[in-house]
Amino acid sequence: MWPNITAAPFLLTGFPGLEAAHHWISIPFFAVYVCILLGNGMLLYLIKHDHSLHEPMYYFLTMLAGTDLMVTLTTMPTVMGILWVNHREISSVGCFLQAYFIHSLSVVESGSLLAMAYDCFIAIRNPLRYASILTNTRVIALGVGVFLRGFVSILPVILRLFSFSYCKSHVITRAFCLHQEIMRLACADITFNRLYPVILISLTIFLDCLIILFSYILILNTVIGIASGEERAKALNTCISHISCVLIFYVTVMGLTFIYRFGKNVPEVVHIIMSYIYFLFPPLMNPVIYSIKTKQIQYGIIRLLSKHRFSS
């Protein structure tokens, strides 16, 4: 089906020039890996088993935590394989699939944050109709739409990777596969693969960011009009966790995009560090932010710990 696909594996790299320190570098990476798994896993478990959290806001948070887990489980096994045992080889199919999931899940994460912004918008701008607007059916439809958009939109460029031949090199300057890294190694016309991602990012991630920004302008306008200071603070507190997660995700996305597109003279180590920050920082911080800033999550954790304490 894919006559031009190479049988040779790709070679991943960790931190070029720091190979001797890979075992030491693996310590903080493994610690972050475990924290991401525990933090997001705890959120998923808590929301599933605590019926007081069975609300649209927490369903969307489940989408975010699930996406963060999938991103981490997609990228970190190859990272740790290199740092621990210097396992650099990855099959071409495995590499393409890893790139597919990484990029798809980035679009899904942006869509999840957009859905959460919609939840905040309805909760503050139209609280009396909140339950009638965000029904379970609509929440499911939004969730399915977010995942379909992410996993379908990235398919065209990934499918083209299967038909390219790779005669330049098989070395990828990351510990995981990214579309832009694979694309550069192809001995073929990659014009479509250069242009499509720019259009896709503009119509998904950047457009999502603009819609979220506009929604918060309207939310702020509503909050300013609330007479009671206590009610104003309560309204703002409803969305403060989401605002923090939005800032972390989109600042890292824009930083990585800016460096990739315009940072030709930026040292390669900066590109590498930014890619790790992009894939690790949001999944690490999102559960921390929601655990600290959201009282319902805090109460849920306390109830969960108390339940296990008394049961033991």
UniProtKB/Swiss-Prot annotation:
Protein name: Olfactory receptor 51B2
Signal sequence segment: none
Function, in words: Odorant receptor.
Pfam families: 7tm_4
Topological region Extracellular: 1-23, 74-97, 159-194, 257-271
Organism: Homo sapiens
Gene that this polypeptide is encoded by: OR51B2
Major location category of this protein: membrane
CDD domains from the UniProt entry: 7tmA_OR51-like
PANTHER family: OLFACTORY RECEPTOR 51B2 (PTHR26450:SF164), OLFACTORY RECEPTOR 56B1-RELATED (PTHR26450)
Family: Belongs to the G-protein coupled receptor 1 family.
Localization terms from the record: Cell membrane
GO cellular component, one term: plasma membrane
